[in-house]
Amino acid sequence: MWKLICIQLTTTTGLSESISTSELTITMNHKDCNPVFREEYFSVLNKVATSGFFTGERCAL
């Protein structure tokens, strides 16, 4: 059974993008471009987190 968790905070600070909830924080650092993030997601199953960041720009990360 997948557990759905609402994102409480999304922040962009220079060369990183973070999503945070009461259970975890995921930060992606990027150096090669300045992407515009359209969507973020994550899920947790058996204490294993999976996440993704989607941009509207082509970007080599």
Curated annotation (Swiss-Prot):
User: What job does the chain carry out?
Assistant: The protein is truncated in this strain and presumably inactive. It has similarities with variola virus CrmB, but the product is inactivated due to several premature stop codon.
Query: Which protein are we looking at?
Result: Truncated Cytokine response-modifying protein B
Organism of provenance? Vaccinia virus (strain Western Reserve) (VACV)
